[in-house]
Structures are given as structure tokens and as C-alpha cells.
Amino acid sequence: MPAAPPQHLSGDAASAGAWLGACAAHWRQTTVLLLLAGTDTAAVPGISAAGATPESRRWTAAADAELLLLGPAAERRHALPPLPAGVSPALIAHGVVSELGLDPLVVDLGAAVAPAVPHLQLGQAPARCLSSGQALEPARVRQLLALGQRWGRLLAAKGPQEPLLIAECVPGGTTTAQAVLTGLGLEVAGLVSGSLLEPVHVLKTELVERGLSAAGLLGPGGMGGPDADPLAVLAAVGDPMQALAAGLVLGAAGAGRPVLLAGGSQMAAVWALALALCSPASRPALARQVAIGTTAWVAAEASSDLALLLQRLGARW
């Protein structure tokens, strides 16, 4: 796999080149994890295009997993709901993993409907709507984070130079991403992308402020404070995918394994959680092992700004 630079780069070009170079010799051994989860935030009318209606969004994660593993020509139990914004990213991902000969592992952390393909079942119920300020039980957050850290360390011990690719499908997840980023003290309103052609920034921000306020985490300027407890923020307004993925990053990248977070705003929230949870002294080494990769559509989306979001994240940590 050529170590070519991405089309759009946010961050240091030399660091990106070094990360790509480190992965180039071992990309055929990449571990691919697709993390499925659910949040009742997806039932808010108008919040997402990952399914045309709140009811259809219940099986979007299952449909994405089945499309990724089986492909568009196969008979699948859960047909992908109509998507007003266009083609599912799962179709693109299927083409990529098929071409590269990679074998994704699907992990269900609490999707509303389980996928009808082989998968690892770690799920409970979907998270509550983030506007409640009680999205997840704190014990569940701690359990998923610890599980991710142990799993990440095991993967690093098995293949320290083999890349780990973490992908997700969480309908409503860009809103939980905005909520977590905001709760951690980042000004990201209007910067977060979504599945809709025109992200509903006002609705997202209203839900985020309601959730953080209900949890007692809303500070001046509509954000969390600089010393916000990341686990408290995650329990208040996050989703299960974020907890496990942050643990995987800390465990795998912390042990020196390259990690690619495949996504946009949702993976920015995972990365922010990982940085907030690790010590300042360990952040530079962690950052050398982690990259976020997304599609050109997300990177260049006119109605959001992932590059600016990542710049603010980098300035914060």
C-alpha cells in the first residue's frame, strides 16, 4: 500500500508521513473492528439521515454491518433503510475491505437491532437520549473503557506493528460526539458533520445544552469546564461506542500499535476522550500512533469544519 498523503490534511505533514510509513509494511495484517451501538438520541425527529424515520434508524447499524460483510448483491435480513443523503458509507467500506482482503470483526455494544452476521456481542441496551443528562450508567462506562484498554493491549502484544482500524455505526452519533466534545470544553457548535446533507446544527446544540445542563456539566459559554471529568461527560451525554473505542486507543496506541480512527466528528470525540483520560506526559507518544481518516465528502463538507474542529482539539490537549 503506497504511503501517499491524504487529500486533505489537518496536522503536521511529517507526522502523517511517518505514521503512513510505519503502517505500509504491515497493512495486510490490519485488524478491522466495526463497533455498533445505539442511542435514543436517534429517535429525535429530524436529527439524522441514517434512516429516513426514527423507526427505520433502529436497524441502520445492523444493516450497515450486513452490507459490510456480505456486500450489496447478497440476500440480507436487514435491508438498508432509504437514505435521503445518498449512498451508505458501508458500501464504500465493503469495496475497500474486499479489495484489500481484510476481514472485519463486528462488535455489537448495544445496537437497537442485532446484525444477522457473525459478530461479537457485548451489548446491553442503547444509550438514553443525551438530552436526559443520563445517557449511560457510570458503571457501564467504566466497564467498557476497561475492556477496551485490555483488548487494545492484547492486540498490541499480538502484533505491535500491525495497524488497528476502528470504525463505527451509531445512528445519532454525531450528536453524542458534539455533546462529548462540548462537555470536554471545546467550542464545536456548527463544526460537527452529520448524515444529513445540511446538518441540523441548531437542533444538535439545543439537545447538547439540555443534556449538559441536566447533568450539571454546563459551564459558561455553553460548554463544559476545562477540568471536566471525561468519564462523567461520557456517562451524561455519550454512547457505548465512544467508551470502548477510547479504551482501545489507550490500550493499543499506548502500547505502540498504530491506530486509525475511521470516521469524522465521532472519531474526533473518541480521540478527545482518549487524550483527556491519559496523562499529559503520555500524550505526545500516544499522538504519534493515532490518525483519524475520513472520506473526502466529510473532510470538504461546506456545512461543517472537521479540520477546524481537530485544530481546536489539538490546541486543547
Task: Describe every region a protein language model picked out.
Residues 1-167, 171-317:
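N-terminal loops that bind phosphate or other acidic moieties
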